[in-house]
Amino acid sequence: MNRHEWRDITQHVPLRIFYGHRILQLILIAVCSFSIFTSPLSAQTKLLIPMDLKQTDHLKSYGIAFWLLEHGGEADWLLNYRGGSFLCDYTDALAKECRIRGVFFEPLAAVEAASLYAEVQREDNNEDVVRLEKTPKIAVYVPPGFKPWDDAVTMALEYAEIPYTKVWDEEVLSGKLAEYDWLHLHHEDFTGQYGKFYANFRGAPWYIEQQMLYEREAKRLGYKKVSEEKKAVARAIKEYIGNGGFMFAMCSATDSYDIALAAENVDICDVMFDGDPMDRNAQAKLDFSKTLAFENFKLDLNPFRYEYSDIDLPPSDPPPIRDPNTDYFTLFEFSAKYDPVPTMLTQDHVNIIKGFMGQTTAFKKSLIKRSITILAEREGTEEVKYIHGNFGRGTFTWYGGHDPEDYQHSVGDPPTDLNLHKNSPGYRLILNNVLFPAAKKKQQKT
């Protein structure tokens, strides 16, 4: 209908009827406009998961990010913004999942999201955006009979509802690690000394069963001694890292791993461990060029001491006496735009974190290779808590201590209930590593 036809019609319509129709038309337009601009797809274009003190469950927030990637979505990790927050496209399904898991979120309109992106990416602001776009395939190195509460990482994965696959020696030695993006190791002993529990637990049923299991497995895989088989596993893991894998280790899986690499051609195990005496010149025969993180360390060859070397600080034998209320370590701050990797690994809502012990509590700074990035340390001491390094096309991150919420974990202690520690800063460092392989690589700024 053209404007002339419209005019002819209106000339034959009573004025009050015409204006009544026009008013109704304007009301309908206004209602439609309001419904469009207040619909969830428009008013709530983004969903922000803040990771500062407002967050109700920091640990499950990582699980939400993982869940989103699993379902084909993407998330932006806002480094150094409100504790390392996550920004995602808003959907009703995502909002529902957050509510189910008790994760606090804030819906953002398009203009708010645009303003937030601009703020984070300002050149004078130590913040940046990292896109998470790939679901990492996670493997956890554990022996048969392992329970999820046996180490902090599997407890964190279980609590955050992040799926993982268990692997052990056969999978590692047969090349199966190539199927995974991320490998975790915890309270392991790659030296073949069964955790150096001999002095206190050699008569315990669990110790005897473990030794028999390890000996059977080594023989089945074609090795005469457990120590030789574990060294082969350590070398296979090193090859996995070199080919682009991500390794995260805690507690004794850190120093015992490097010791196994350095002692590749040296017998460092006494007769009660492998049936023959150790090489008395073992220390002089160590090859530090084969290690990833440590050098110039001295082995503790006493089979009755619960210690592998002088890497561990403070030494585990005798057990150190410390006040948990005064034991803290400090995270270093990195440039989000120029050093995104260490920045990702240190995202947290606090930068001073309560300490915790383990068979390997921390690392002696003077024994750490210069190529390694120190992520956290106990200020005023030689104790380094958290380190990161590169090897080949892959990376490794090592974290001292056994359980961030169990200060002095002992054999037989009950598992930590993470429902009571859902905002744990120490556990957040573990989960930073889980999401790290999901990050899209971008060109380094120069």
PLM regions: where:
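Hydrophobic targeting/anchoring helices
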Residues: 43-151, 160, 401
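Extracellular ligand-binding/catalytic regions of CAZymes and related secreted enzymes
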Residues: 44-50, 56-87, 267, 367-446
